[in-house]
């Protein structure tokens, strides 16, 4: 959830061996599926605002929607409400998260024409038909993928022409001094206001050291452009978190 790439600002705050860490991001989030909602609201400043702003920039009537990293369904539930006639495909690497989001989303479908399918898979392993989706969306998940160029190329292949790719995620600050400052502000937010326990903060930092890969906005923009996206914009930003929107060329 909260992290930095290897060798970055995370080294200021935490060092430990990989043998002591969860062996995958899916394993980490699977182990905390039931407590995830509480923690994300306490550990991510302005979380609800970020989700609301992401929804603001989605197209009006997409028919086929892919969500990458659906987690417990915080964004998924909003997608069902916003697009009641759409075909939704929700993807997460954690079986525990898929089970939880299925129970929440299926329970919200009464009276809705939405069709929802669920896939347990890593983003890199998705096997879906090309040009299958009008909208691809994600929230605080893409930073778990190291090779974003390959990921963006794969996402582009799944999208119909003029489809929209919009995501909220953690973005590496630039210059490096800004990245470090963002980390300091986040840690102050968690510690001084008592939003997270010391054990929760340590767990987040451990996860970050093992599994998170930050990308700057400049790098995101270049990779998206190179892999077939245009109209790229950062429409919201708060410390480490930001929202990026783009269109399949």
Task: Tell me what each language-model feature is.
Residues 45-63:
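Conserved alpha-helix/loop element of class I SAM-dependent methyltransferases that forms part
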Residues 128-135:
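A short acidic, Gly/Pro-enriched loop at the edge of an enzyme's catalytic core
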Residues 168-227, 233:
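C-terminal alpha-helical "lid/dimerization" subdomain adjacent to the S-adenosyl-L-methionine
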Residues 66-68, 72-125:
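Class I SAM-dependent methyltransferase SAM/SAH-binding core
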Residues 140-141:
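Short catalytic micro-motifs in class I SAM-dependent methyltransferases
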Residues 12-35, 186:
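N-terminal, positively charged/glycine-rich alpha-helical extensions of SAM-dependent methyltransferases
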Residues 150-161:
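A short glycine-rich, Lys/Arg-flanked "PGG" loop and its adjoining helix->strand segment in the class I
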Residues 223, 227-249:
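Core SAM-dependent methyltransferase catalytic element
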